[in-house]
Amino acid sequence: MFRHPLAGIQLVEGTVEASESPADAARRELFKESGLDTKQRLFFIGKNTRMVCGQIWYFYHLDLLCTRNQSSHFAPDDGGIELQFYWHALLAPPPPDCGALYARVLNYARPQLLRRLQL
């Protein structure tokens, strides 16, 4: 998760461009918003057409080893902004300052991830 200085708590997400697959879009958005450039396999965990009317949301899981609990990334969008990243426990409820959309996303993704991780 990350804290956007103007928009609050968010998750990495974005639009699938016409020339790319949903997995390629996920990888591109991950790099753009977090600076993580990975060639590791992304695991598809779900597709949802009810998050936002008229949109298809694709969900991916990435196995990632990380030694830091928090980090920041300068994203060039919107004139350049600093995003504060942190890990959110899988079984924890959405943070109280998380917007309703991202709370729904977390609540949708949690059981998909638990199945994927066989927890």
Language-model segment annotations:
Residues M1-V12:
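N-terminal strand-loop-strand
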Residues F2, I45, H88:
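Hydrophobic residues at beta-strand termini and immediately following loops
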Residues A7, Q40, I56-Y58:
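A generic structural signal for short beta-strands and their flanking turns/coil linkers
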Residues A7-I9, P76-L119:
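Nudix hydrolase/Nudix homology domain
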Residues L11, Q55-W57, G80:
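Short connector loops at helix/strand junctions that flank enzyme active sites
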Residues L11-F44:
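The catalytic Nudix box helix
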Residues E13-G14, N48, P93:
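Conserved short-loop catalytic and cofactor-binding motifs
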Residues T49-F74, Y86-L91, V105-Q112:
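Active-site-adjacent beta-strand/loop module that shapes the phosphate/pyrophosphate-binding cleft
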